[in-house]
Amino acid sequence: MLSLESIKKAPRADGFASILAIGRANPDNIIEQSAYPDFYFRVTNSEHLVDLKKKFQRICEKTAIRKRHFVWNEEFLTANPCFSTFMDKSLNVRQEVAISEIPKLGAKAATKAIEDWGQPKSRITHLIFCTTSGMDLPGADYQLTQILGLNPNVERVMLYQQGCFAGGTTLRLAKCLAESRKGARVLVVCAETTTVLFRAPSEEHQDDLVTQALFADGASAVIVGADPDEAADERASFVIVSTSQVLLPDSAGAIGGHVSEGGLLATLHRDVPQIVSKNVGKCLEEAFTPFGISDWNSIFWVPHPGGRAILDQVEERVGLKPEKLSVSRHVLAEYGNMSSVCVHFALDEMRKRSANEGKATTGEGLEWGVLFGFGPGLTVETVVLRSVPL
């Protein structure tokens, strides 16, 4: 019989948790940002709002987004006219789509991550699923185990309604799980859809135009584990050295999301870029002082691309060279703001770009890097990463 002491002393991992694989997925429906204002006002029967459309066109032009992917399409919107009225009772329809599509979109990303990992899925010991899109019992984590055929004893964590900072949250939790048990392999999946927040424009609620111009659909999957099994050709892409979360001072209400019968209504205060950029220096100092690093151009950057203004003001405030945020800007341009998904896309883009350009490491040839998640609260997740040689 095992003693309590022997159970307590179950072997932990020897090393740091590492990102062992990354997968990503997007829906097939693509809309160019330049064409989106015409599409948006046409499908919502709002073309009579001429001045509002001109304002929306200006907003879209400033986003630095080239295209976005969506689960929904024009046929769906036509069949559900409740989406063509601002805050019409539509929660049931939104829920049905999210509950159906989020697990499937997440499974596509997870399948790619497992292929990238190159190990049998039976080695997955934990699952973290994160979405701000719809809620159900059992949740999207359960649905994913059924789609992928994961072991029934996989230990699951379901995160709902976290928002844009959660790409960092999932890595923080995965690090704790991976390092707490020798041999643990954590599958992290984030999946988001704008089905929960798409709605017609309103002259009385013009703040929502920014939401309609920014957000998009996608899914990411990351496999995290410590002590890569070199004999099985398991290889790390990034080492997760440390993680932290903080609520920024004087930021209550700056970013939020409120669910009602009309769906999820996001609030994005115009001061968000200023609040984030004002505080990012302190986050950097607290994270990197233990490692003797204070030159922010000497590390690689993976901030959440919540919007062009956030990236611009962080770059200016910290004194970054323009190329330091190129990966996050690329993700924003090609996919829009996919909430929790974005930073995982950026990590994948960085390692692939580094390899293609012949860099010495997965982090643009640099050793140390930072990943930031920004979201409701205003909450900041800070993840210190270490690249690996290529």
Swiss-Prot record:
Enzyme Commission number: 2.3.1.-
Domain of life: Eukaryota
Record-linked CDD domains: CHS_like
Pfam families named among the record's database cross-references: Chal_sti_synt_C (PF02797), Chal_sti_synt_N (PF00195)
Gene3D superfamilies from the UniProt entry: 3.40.47.10
Molecular function, one GO term: acyltransferase activity, transferring groups other than amino-acyl groups
Similarity comment: Belongs to the thiolase-like superfamily. Chalcone/stilbene synthases family.
Name of the protein in question: Bibenzyl synthase
Source organism (scientific name): Phalaenopsis sp. (Moth orchid)
